[in-house]
């Protein structure tokens, strides 16, 4: 029988298994231990608990093996940790740890710290991807290809320009993460179950001891809100949704019907009956898991939206969706980066398509307008010539020499990629 509800009785194994979060708590067990140590040290600081008891608990916490806490007989890791401490130190010593705390504020704190840790892992993966993108963009700065709009050949660009578009997406994602990280760095400790603690907890001090940089002011909001989780998961899933568009391009370009991309052998599989097949399975899985992450985001919102402002056990069920989103993102970015490092691009074939499918038509019409012909007149004249097979278009290399910042001009691509690589060299990952 679980520790906290032992005085109630009536618990069966079926119910315990059904309501326990112990398996999911593997994601936060280290943070739970860290927060407990900060809590007991602070109790001693303010004279709310005997110093000797706090020191004994802190020493035991430094010796605990987290995996030993993850046993199915408990409701959650908080209960498992307290029972472990009581068994090890006795109630006269370990019995003080419940003062001034609730599972509500402590689990919110643990989730914030674990989310901050996992966000750091994801950020490093994205930064490394950006460096690979910049390196390959510089390599392919002059590699002409058609862009695609409506899945039709469109304006001529270079593959380097395309890769820098993915890099800019990654940069914007990291920018969006900054204010979300500020939310994660605020501590709910001392908020108690909903209205604060009777013990003289200095919330700023215990926040600092636990590794936070500020506090969530209102105790009800601090213990019961999961806005920080919604914000983080939303940002990550938005990034995955956008990144999966690029992944989809690479899957299409890997088809021999297009033939732009040669995928590395380590990223392809074959058919059990058609031995000629080279299926880009890693990116197919990425695409599917990005969709799965979107489902986790919807589930997270659905769980949170109708439970009132205070804590309910529904929130326990919400947290696993946050971990799923973060884990899917970190693993997917790592795999995609490996693909980007090892793939090759057929510049000759891409250039031939850019020439074949009128990808310099807009530049040709603009060039005529810049020489004094009203643009729409030049546009319709060129349209007639294309229809009649008599169009004389600007050569691809000349069309690419567009003067605008951020264009597909190879010199602009080299400038942007080189600037990013300077950052990569200054901050090696």
From Swiss-Prot:
Stated EC number for the protein is: 4.3.2.1
Query: Under the cellular component aspect of Gene Ontology, which terms does the record hold?
Result: cytosol
State where the protein is found.
Cytoplasm
Q: Offer an example of a GO molecular function term for this protein.
A: argininosuccinate lyase activity
Q: Per UniProt, which keywords does this protein have?
A: Amino-acid biosynthesis, Arginine biosynthesis, Cytoplasm, Lyase
Pathway it works in = Amino-acid biosynthesis; L-arginine biosynthesis; L-arginine from L-ornithine and carbamoyl phosphate: step 3/3
- Record's InterPro entries? Argininosuccinate_lyase (IPR009049), Fumarase/histidase_N (IPR024083), Fumarate_lyase_fam (IPR000362), Fumarate_lyase_N (IPR022761), L-Aspartase-like (IPR008948)
Q: Look up the record and give one Gene Ontology term from the biological process aspect.
A: arginine biosynthetic process via ornithine
| PANTHER family referenced in this protein's UniProt entry, alphabetically | ARGININOSUCCINATE LYASE (PTHR43814:SF1)
Name the record gives this protein:
Argininosuccinate lyase
Organism expressing this protein natively:
Pyrobaculum neutrophilum (strain DSM 2338 / JCM 9278 / NBRC 100436 / V24Sta)
